[in-house]
Amino acid sequence: MITLTGHTLTVEEMKRLLLEGEGVTACPNSMQKVAECREVVEKIVEDGKVVYGITTGFGKFSDVLIQKEDVKALQHNLIQSHACGIGDPFPEEVSRGMLILRANTMLKGVSGVRPLVVNMLLEFVNRKIHPVVPQQGSLGASGDLAPLSHLALVLLGEGEVFYKGKRAHAMVALTEEGLEPIELEAKEGLALINGTQAMTAQGVLSYIEAEATAYQAELIASMTIEGLQGIIDAFDENVHKARGYKEQVEVASRIRDILHDSKLTTKQGELRVQDAYSLRCIPQVHGASWQVLNYVKEKLEIEMNAATDNPLIFDGGEKVISGGNFHGQPIAFAMDFLKVGMAELANISERRIERLVNPQLNDLPPFLSPEPGLQSGAMIMQYAAASLVSENKTLAHPASVDSIPSSANQEDHVSMGTIASRHAHQIIQNVRRVLSIEMICAMQAAEYRGIENMSTVTKSFYHQGRQQVPSITNDRIFSTDIENITHWLKTNYSIKERLDVNAAL
């Protein structure tokens, strides 16, 4: 059970919450702050003060005063009218993440909701009732209005949820769990939907997958080094310390550890003086991607614990301030950066695939074919990898450089952060497929070199991979092999836990 405080949530805790189904509870001190802040909102309504989002309309309607008797209707109308999401739903892990992050930001005690609202969000998390939230429709400012409106709907007993492995109407799940839908009061609708929790939840899942995929890329690249009898000197510690990037040093160190007892690596000048960049520069390229990952993790953990709605309430109600913390620009930039960093892992992987299958670049059978000419072997696998990396180049175009004014130009600059976050996740799926192709080719190359000559780590990884796909002895439908390895990497070596090189032993 993980305790939410509004200040201390980490990516590692989110991994347990999203992927292992761990439950959540609220810190009592934080809940006390929620209750105290709520008293301020109720006094504002009672006194008839003009405060944006509490006693006024929204966006361009911020100058329209709302009467006390209409305050509840205002919040309900807000949720229904803003539930304009379209397209396929977010993965269930992402909608679960939205619930968690929304509760966490409310626990900072500056949003003005009742403790009841926070408790309802936590009930949904712990009972695994996850809102069906369409992926498209957010501008990333004022936050993720459309996606979070679909989240808010289910608290009211409206909309759809993922429940016990099926899609169902929210009331079906509420009834079965013995829960009553809530009726929103002043500010609560706005507090639920005005924030960055859709882009951030998707970003967290993307980061978790990206981190594990980056470790996998090192292990698979190590198999390719063996298959091509790569020069191990290029990974010498002195080379990488001379440049000074810690991530580069760490990648080189891990690859040395993976290959320390391999009989397939060579020394400088033994077969050739130096390798092509796609082998020699693995620490430099992969290390740079780790720099991106470290940056992204830092920004995500700030945003996961940020107050991102509007207005915010401070000093016991002395200050009720309209600001712009809902603007998703920090996460938009981070997700665009993640897209580029991960796409590059696929780019260099595809070049290693080419070196494995091109007979002009190695002494292996052409296209790793068991009978070149009659059988094409891995020829079209390289085509598939090339297609995926080219698709990634399109997806890697920054979403954050775009902005379209909305709400009659009141909201005249937006982040498009949710688009960036969604595209980052798509890129990661493509990267995993490219790495799967590299692994299939590297395993085949290892067989020509002699499995007994592989390192202890890569040999273990090879045998586990061969449990997923057989050796290429004849042409067959290779798309099945690619998807099998891709699924295996995701479910066994990916987002369940951080990949340690010794995990393959």
Curated annotation (Swiss-Prot):
InterPro entries per record: Aromatic_Lyase (IPR001106), Fumarase/histidase_N (IPR024083), HutH (IPR005921), L-Aspartase-like (IPR008948), Phe/His_NH3-lyase_AS (IPR022313)
Gene3D superfamilies given in the database record: Fumarase/aspartase (Central domain) (1.20.200.10), Fumarase/aspartase (N-terminal domain) (1.10.275.10)
PTMs per UniProt: Contains an active site 4-methylidene-imidazol-5-one (MIO), which is formed autocatalytically by cyclization and dehydration of residues Ala-Ser-Gly.
Pathway linked to the protein: Amino-acid degradation; L-histidine degradation into L-glutamate; N-formimidoyl-L-glutamate from L-histidine: step 1/3
Molecular function GO labels: histidine ammonia-lyase activity
2,3-didehydroalanine (Ser) modification, residue list: S142
HAMAP family: His_ammonia_lyase
Name listed for the protein in its UniProt record: Histidine ammonia-lyase
Organism of derivation: Bacillus cereus (strain ZK / E33L)
Chain's gene name: hutH
